[in-house]
């Protein structure tokens, strides 16, 4: 069914909550393991209609944040979502109370029962009102960001549409683009500062109600991190600071030499090549045709997937006024249909987001069609889900010539370099958030000062050269995740460590790398992050010294593939 033929009906929350109570009672009373397994499948399907409606509403709202009807529907789910989540948690609580619960681990793997325990530990009826308030705060942020229109080059442009100007070979044009963006954020400075303060206060209040010191502790439970915690993440960040950042300084020196910009400032960083960055082929149809060919040649599984996605028009990837920034993949369970949202801006990032979100969508497509995988175990934790997307960016490399033509080698270098350099920024975002939630009384200026300290630690090569907004340490406010889904960002770093290993493996044997990837994908959400890495034969990055060799291999490859 094509996306525009999918019907939306606001769900009956009362009926759903009553059904949840019934399922919880049945879970508590299930007489044996077989009955409990059957009931787990049943409860997993019970939310399909609700989730489909919620995701349809969110797709329509993010595609046009100015549409009053879809704004009202989004508000409905913001208001009712916490109650539905808590009802789901009560079902988990009932499963956990059943003496046969260990059968679920035997049937579905470690993440099933561990995930239910995290769900119970991460939710509380007393926080429902606070959760509703948090959702409303996020919607306010999305409206500020999604409603951004700036004047440049005689045009009204969205933030994503500034992308090509930021990559212009004329430094004055790049500076003007960043200043236009900065002007918009500075104009909303007071509101953005106030919003973030309210978000920190709200989430810390939720944590304290539930007996946690602050939200940085609760986040590990709510993010469903299984098998590791704050100490492992700290060790990971330390390895990045000590073993990756020194290599990145060499990489940035190579970039400066390559571009001929001897002393690059922040607005020079998007320039990767003296004669301009690689540009993908123009035109929606041409790109979609190339993507279809690419996925048909990659594997039979991806051929079936891309046909389904394109034939059912499950993409909205072109930027326009009123559309929310960013990119995502979501799922419409009733239709077993993934959906991909993006904001193309005619830079190489268009291919990044296409292959990235197709990685998420491919995993969802495969899991939704596996009868052994319950609906709520179709997707693993976010640090693992991002492996599907980030590794897909690299594993499609043999077909990138279809999208870049003569710029293919430039894109290969740019993409590998960007992914490697990203590790530092991702760790910076994570450490910043730990500081913010552990020190909630910091003033807006003090928050910005902390960000600038972390810039020196993780990205010492950056010179803001007096740039508004960024120069005062407020650039973090442009990072949607910090407002919308705190503590998510480190997941990108953990998955990048897996993706870089897939990249290095593919250089030696692409077929073997793809088969390892497919094994990982097919485990869906029924294995933890470390178990998934072991499935694919990859190193776990929490272990001391585990990153150093990968960092050296990446630097060596980048040194020998300068264009």
Regions found by a protein language model. Give the residues of each.
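A well-structured
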Residues: 1-278
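Auxiliary, metal-adjacent structural segments of Zn-dependent hydrolase domains
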Residues: 274-334, 347-348
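Inter-helical turn/loop segments and adjacent helix faces that build the functional surface
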Residues: 230-231, 254, 258, 298-301, ...
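Long, well-ordered alpha-helical segments
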Residues: 196-213, 251-255, 359-369, 390-407
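Glycine- and acidic
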Residues: 122-123, 179-188, 228-234, 269-280, ...
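C-terminal, non-catalytic "cap/extension" segments appended to globular domains
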Residues: 115-117, 227, 318, 354, ...
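Post-HExxH zinc-binding segment in Zn-dependent metallohydrolases
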Residues: 242-243, 367-368, 379-407, 415-416, ...
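Active-site recognition of the HExxH zinc-binding catalytic motif
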Residues: 342-368, 389-390, 394, 432, ...
